[in-house]
Amino acid sequence: MRRAHRAGERVMMKRFGIALLAVAIAAGASSLTAQTVTSGLHGPAPLNDEGPAPPMLPNRNTSEREVRNYPEQPPVIPHTIDGYQVDLNGNKCLSCHARARTAESQAPMVSITHFMDRDGQFWPSISPRRFFCTECHVPQNTATPPVSNDFTDIDTLLSRASPGGRR
């Protein structure tokens, strides 16, 4: 008789423990949804709300070429490209950057890699997979970074690593 009574107590304790755990989980979940967590990038709006969009800042519009930060980085676009057509019907970028137009426009020529297909074969014109410039090349705007950045470019890293700062 005592064994049956103890077994019944154990079952009741297990059920009580499970019920208590369920109540604790529910209370914790409801307190999490009530909190507003803020992030430097998201702003003061609650995470499940969409805050107002930040204002669009003007693009830099200069003829200066920017230094690349790492090898093989696509060059950034130093001028505005508002209204440029870059689609299946045409590519406004090539009116200055095409091989035949660079002498007249004084713009840098499209890289020779843009004339290669995925098999390494050269084409007489831009490879279709490189036709849409803005997939890799982007204009730069005047925004201040929303978070601090201590990025160091490759040349600086290499000069620190070499004796005497030389490469």
From Swiss-Prot:
A UniProt-annotated Pfam family: NapB
Keyword match Signal: yes
GO CC terms: periplasmic space
Main subcellular localisation: periplasm
PTM field: Binds 2 heme C groups per subunit.
Region (Disordered): 40-65
InterPro entries: Multihaem_cyt_sf (IPR036280), NapB (IPR005591)
Binding site for heme c 2: 114, 133, 136-137
Localization in the cell: Periplasm
Assembly and interaction partners: Component of the periplasmic nitrate reductase NapAB complex composed of NapA and NapB.
Family label: Belongs to the NapB family.
Protein's name in the database: Periplasmic nitrate reductase, electron transfer subunit
Native source species: Bradyrhizobium japonicum
Protein's gene: napB
